[in-house]
Amino acid sequence: MSRKPPKKSDMGKSWMKPRRDSRQMISPEYHLIVSEGTKTEPTYFEKIKETIDAKYRDRIHLDISGKGDNTVNLFNRAVKDVARSNNVYKHVWLVFDKDDFPAENFDHTVELCEAESTEETRYHPIWSNQCIELWFLLHFMFLQSDLHRDEYWPKLTECLKSRNLGIYYKNRTDMFDVLRPYMDDAIRNAKMLEEINTGRTPSKSAPGTMVHYLIRTLKPYL
C-alpha cells in the first residue's frame, strides 16, 4: 500500500515536524589547575579531582599540573599550556605561594591573570601568603599573625594530633580527606582574612590566601 504525501495544509504543523532527540550531550566545563609546587598542591587537588570524577565526570573536568615554577614564570607556562591544549578551559587556576619571592613578581602575577582573562577563559590567581599550609591551618583555627612558612608545620601537627589525625608532613597524600569535614570553617576564616586585607596588595596581605575561591567553585561537586 503506497503512502500518501502529506497535505499542503498540514505542512508546518507541530505534529508534522520531525522530533528532536532530547538526549543532547552537554560538554563538561573544563578547569586547569596549575600549581607552583610539584607534590603538596598537586596531591591535594588530585584527591579533589578523584572525588569529583566519581560522580560528576560528565559535568566538570579538572586537569592538574605541578610545574615547579613560580609567580610570573608559572603564569607564562600556564598560558602556553592553554594554547597547546585541545581542551577549551573555562577556568585556569594558578596556585602559588609568596614564600621569599620578590613582592613585585608576586603582585604582577595577579595583574597578569586579570589582563589575560577573556570571556572564553578566565585566569584566577590563587595565591597564599606565605604558603598553602595557611589554607590547611584555617580548617582548624583563625590565624591573623604573620608567621614564617616554617612555623605552620608544628601548628598543623598540633591541630591534627589534638583530633587524632596524625601529624603534618610535606606531601601527605590524605590531606584533602583529613581536612574535608572542616572545609566550611576554612572558607569562613579565609574570607575573614580577605576582609581584613582589603586595600592591601597580595604581597602585603600576610597572612592571606585565595584558595577558598577555588574550593567554593568546586564545592557543589564535592
Where are these regions (language model features)?
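Short phosphate-binding loop-to-helix
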Residues: 67-77
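Short polar catalytic/cofactor-binding loops
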Residues: 39
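Short hydrophobic beta-strand that contains or immediately precedes a catalytic carboxylate
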Residues: 33-36
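C-terminal accessory helical subdomains adjacent to catalytic cores in phosphodiester-
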Residues: 1-30, 42, 46-65, 81-93, ...
